């Protein structure tokens, strides 16, 4: 509670801030209402863990910071036809792949950045092919990179589609698109062009793949359950079931590892890799989400086996490639493999290991010319392992205590918070404050605007 003497000390400061705060409030009111705002502090319906960080506040602050860094590295308007795109890195001359747009749209909807989401989706629509799906590779100047790049990649389009469903749940009909209509059309295009008729096998793309070649890392059963309910097409449940049927046949019975590519019978696909490498590593991330959200038993069985494989190796010794029987074929300790190993731990019950692999995920971040893939998966997994990746299709945001302004995180909003925020702004040191509580206007920055709004809150 704020005492009368405290109010007097702040009154002159507050009155000086009223004009700037009124401008700020007008700007905030003009943006679309977010029905499910970040941070989520979610408790997943299934599993022992939702947040592996030492505290929810620490986890929230971490992902906010990582998100800003990720955007700085991978969001650009250069070569984006007037919109925004996700660029890769120097190793590919900063090109764009549709997979990156899938990740970028998912991240922007989870962080509640509607303008960025709309700009990314406008870029997607520029490059929709004749099947209504995104051409998979575009150069840094905005040109499709040859005839082989016109086709679509299934993992990208299913991520784009589910992000549109989530956008509908978050923002309704506000913004530049009717997200509901866009989502239904996109999902139907995927089903018609990327699901093999009669078998329910997820194809590799809109023009190739099926029973003869499929990719387990493209299997997104949690998405398919959403697609089924959202569109009324129960065929998507058959697709989800088929994914586990194929994975059961392809995975090694001792290690639990799945291959990059296989046939629907689980055997090697002609001309494709059969190791647990940079495609296959994503399988347990997608499967773990299916367990956390829907409690799918097969997902837990598969993830627990892969997690046990990594646990036996040791979280600090994880390398970036194995045969499915467990023989090491590469020697790098990368964000791709460490982060997806952390995702697999979410289905288990070994808290010591889960905490250790999560902390290793926080620690290991790729640098140099090869940063896009690993650091993007790491960003996705950090959201998931900090309780900030709930199922936005079914999630109901629970009322939370209003802690905005409790800068020093002591459970009270008082003069100490004013002092703590002032010190943080002047010294540019935020390690001793709650960034979530200090960010009064939820813009991701700690600055004089937050200071002014905190003073108004104290007066009230």
Swiss-Prot record:
Q: Which GO terms describe its molecular function?
A: cellulase activity
InterPro entries (UniProt xref): 6-hairpin_glycosidase_sf (IPR008928), 6hp_glycosidase-like_sf (IPR012341), Dockerin_1_rpt (IPR002105), Dockerin_dom (IPR016134), Dockerin_dom_sf (IPR036439), EF_Hand_1_Ca_BS (IPR018247), Glyco_hydro_8 (IPR002037), Glyco_hydro_8_CS (IPR019834)
Q: In which pathway does it act?
A: Glycan metabolism; cellulose degradation
Is Chaperone one of the keywords? no
UniProt-listed GO biological process terms: cellulose catabolic process
Query: What is the catalytic activity of this protein?
Result: Endohydrolysis of (1->4)-beta-D-glucosidic linkages in cellulose, lichenin and cereal beta-D-glucans
Signal peptide from the UniProt entry: 1-32
Entry PTM: There are two forms of the cellulase. The shorter form lacks probably the C-terminal reiterated domains.
Every copy of the Dockerin domain together lies at 400-460
* This protein's record includes keyword Hydrolase: yes
Q: State the EC number(s).
A: 3.2.1.4
Q: Which UniProt keywords apply?
A: Carbohydrate metabolism, Cellulose degradation, Glycosidase, Hydrolase, Polysaccharide degradation, Signal
Subunit annotation: Monomer.
What is the similarity comment for this entry? Answer: Belongs to the glycosyl hydrolase 8 (cellulase D) family.
Q: Which protein are we looking at?
A: Endoglucanase C
Q: Which source organism?
A: Ruminiclostridium cellulolyticum (strain ATCC 35319 / DSM 5812 / JCM 6584 / H10) (Clostridium cellulolyticum)
């Amino acid at each position: 509670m704020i005492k009368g003497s405290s109010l007097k000390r702040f009154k002159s400061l507050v009155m000086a801030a009223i004009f700037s705060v009124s401008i700020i409030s007008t700007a905030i009111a003009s943006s679309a209402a977010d029905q499910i705002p970040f941070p989520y502090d979610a408790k997943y319906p299934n599993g022992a863990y939702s947040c592996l960080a030492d505290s929810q506040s620490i986890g929230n602050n971490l992902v906010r910071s990582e998100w800003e860094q990720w955007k700085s590295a991978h969001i650009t308007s250069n070569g984006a036809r007037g919109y925004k795109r996700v660029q890769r890195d120097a190793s590919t001359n900063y090109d764009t792949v549709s997979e990156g747009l899938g990740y970028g749209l998912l991240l922007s909807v989870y962080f509640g950045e509607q303008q960025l989401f709309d700009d990314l989706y406008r870029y997607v629509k520029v490059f929709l092919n004749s099947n209504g799906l995104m051409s998979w590779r575009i150069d840094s100047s905005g040109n499709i990179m040859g005839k082989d790049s016109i086709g679509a990649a299934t993992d990208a389009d299913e991520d784009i589609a589910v992000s549109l469903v989530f956008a509908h749940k978050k923002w309704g009909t506000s913004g530049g698109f009717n997200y509901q209509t866009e989502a239904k059309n996109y999902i139907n295009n995927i089903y018609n062009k990327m699901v093999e008729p009669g078998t329910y096998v997820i194809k590799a793309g809109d023009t190739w793949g099926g029973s003869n070649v499929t990719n387990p890392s493209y299997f997104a059963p949690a998405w398919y359950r959403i697609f089924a309910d959202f569109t009324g097409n129960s065929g998507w449940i058959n697709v989800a079931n088929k994914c586990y049927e194929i994975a059961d046949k392809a995975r090694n019975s001792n290690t639990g590892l799945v291959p990059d590519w296989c046939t629907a019978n689980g055997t090697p696909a002609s001309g494709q890799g059969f190791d647990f490498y940079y495609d296959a590593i994503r399988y347990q991330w997608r499967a773990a989400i299916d367990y956390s959200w829907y409690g799918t038993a097969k997902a837990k069985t598969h993830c627990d086996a892969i997690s046990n494989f990594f646990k036996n190796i040791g979280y600090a010794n994880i390398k970036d490639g194995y045969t499915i029987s467990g023989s090491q074929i590469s020697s790098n300790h990368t964000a791709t493999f460490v982060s997806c190993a952390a995702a697999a731990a979410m289905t288990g019950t070994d808290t010591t290991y889960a905490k250790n692999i999560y902390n290793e995920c926080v620690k290991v971040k790729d640098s140099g010319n090869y940063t896009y893939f690993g650091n993007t998966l790491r960003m996705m997994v950090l959201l998931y392992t900090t309780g900030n990746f709930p199922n936005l299709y079914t999630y109901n945001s629970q009322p939370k205590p209003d802690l905005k302004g409790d800068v020093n995180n002591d459970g009270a909003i008082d003069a100490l918070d004013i002092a703590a925020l002032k010190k943080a702004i002047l010294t540019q040191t935020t390690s001793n404050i709650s960034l979530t509580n200090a960010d009064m206007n939820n813009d991701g920055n700690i600055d004089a605007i937050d200071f002014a709004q905190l003073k108004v809150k104290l007066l009230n």
